[in-house]
Amino acid sequence: MKILVTGGAGFIGSAVVRHIINNTQDSVVNVDKLTYAGNLESLAEISDSERYSFENADICDAEGDGLYFGQHQLDAVMHLAAESHVDRSITGPAAFIETNIVGTYVLLEAARNYWSGLDDEKKKNFRFHHISTDEVYGDLPHPDEVNSNETLQLFTETTAYAPSSPYSASKASSDHLVRAWKRTYGLPTIVSNCSNNYGPYHFPEKLIPLVILNALEGKALPIYGKGDQIRDWLYVEDHARALYTVVTEGKAGETYNIGGHNEKKNIDVVFTICDLLDEIVPKEKSYREQITYVADRPGHDRRYAIDADKISRELGWKPQETFESGIRKTVEWYLANTNWVENVKSGAYQSWIEQNYEGRQ
């Protein structure tokens, strides 16, 4: 099987590529624009494989997209290329509209044109797997907002869309496009929506790597509001396994929610990281003393939580990592891979961190 992975140099994309090359006999064509969060160092361990090839390209380039399909005789697409940071979408939404909506449209058209020329058997087996987020659903009631005897709601595959940021709105739009191409043209598409990912090779603008690295450098650990926002945390290698299961075994036209069964308040995640660092690299004062509370993000969703029963029941996937095991592996990875960290911390990244957090004191 030959799979086109878009955004394969990003955090989740690189985990998918590593999983496919290391654990299957399938081949990967990785198409990535290499924006600030794309890093080929994350693929160093598999880059010499004969089953792996890389194209430095933009999915918004219709001519290029069509070329890759024809050249490589693809059996499936795993579409992960996206602008994905909520804070960046608030200060600069245009890039999110261009990549997440227009880019998805261009890729869908390239896939449809290629698929329409396949023989019947290959048409039937072809898959266009669009990887999305649980943020398209909006947010859920917080435990502080409901009676103690009430059952807390979870996002299911039939939850109505209610995106609340430019990022989630752009992903919701792309989800609708993918489903429309299935219904209108018959293109065999699948959508998956995941909870918050964490793990090795995570670009340090996101909460967990930001906290780990700031703590080690003696910097403030910025927490939005009171830190009581709740997220369901999914170890990235568990997610990569799930995505491969979906593209190879999932049913065309279906949606699969993928979650880690690990609901945690943001502040508790930060406490856990600080306590692990106190254990592994102790210093005179606890890392918790570096925690700083900053003004909350506009429109910050209160709670996300995934019901992953469908993918477990129909495809047999379950996460292997608990949050406790996964976060320890993550902290240990960052401690052992300081060269990777230094190489991704460019001047552009540093200026963005200063712009985003210094104004929130």
Swiss-Prot record:
SUPFAM superfamilies: NAD(P)-binding Rossmann-fold domains
Matches recorded under CDD domains: dTDP_GD_SDR_e (cd05246)
Pathway(s) this gene product operates in, as recorded in its UniProt entry: Carbohydrate biosynthesis; dTDP-L-rhamnose biosynthesis; Bacterial outer membrane biogenesis; LPS O-antigen biosynthesis
E.C. no: 4.2.1.46
Residues reported in the UniProt entry to bind substrate: 84, 133, 196, 206-207, 222-224, 231, 266, 296-300
Amino-acid positions noted as binding NAD(+) in the UniProt annotation, renumbered to this chain: 11-12, 32-35, 58-59, 80-84, 99, 167-171, 197
Enzyme class per UniProt: lyase
Biological process, per Gene Ontology: dTDP-rhamnose biosynthetic process; lipopolysaccharide biosynthetic process; O antigen biosynthetic process; polysaccharide biosynthetic process
Cofactor(s) essential for the protein: NAD(+)
Cofactor note: Binds 1 NAD(+) per subunit.
Molecular function (Gene Ontology), one example: dTDP-glucose 4,6-dehydratase activity
Source organism, top-level taxon: Bacteria
InterPro entries, A to Z: dTDP_Gluc_deHydtase, NAD(P)-bd_dom, NAD(P)-bd_dom_sf
Catalytic residues (positions): 134-135, 167
A Pfam family per the record: GDP_Man_Dehyd
Family to which the UniProt record says this protein belongs: Belongs to the NAD(P)-dependent epimerase/dehydratase family. dTDP-glucose dehydratase subfamily.
Complexes and interactors: Homodimer.
Function: Catalyzes the dehydration of dTDP-D-glucose to form dTDP-6-deoxy-D-xylo-4-hexulose via a three-step process involving oxidation, dehydration and reduction.
Official protein name in the record: dTDP-glucose 4,6-dehydratase
Lineage: Bacteria, Pseudomonadati, Pseudomonadota, Gammaproteobacteria, Enterobacterales
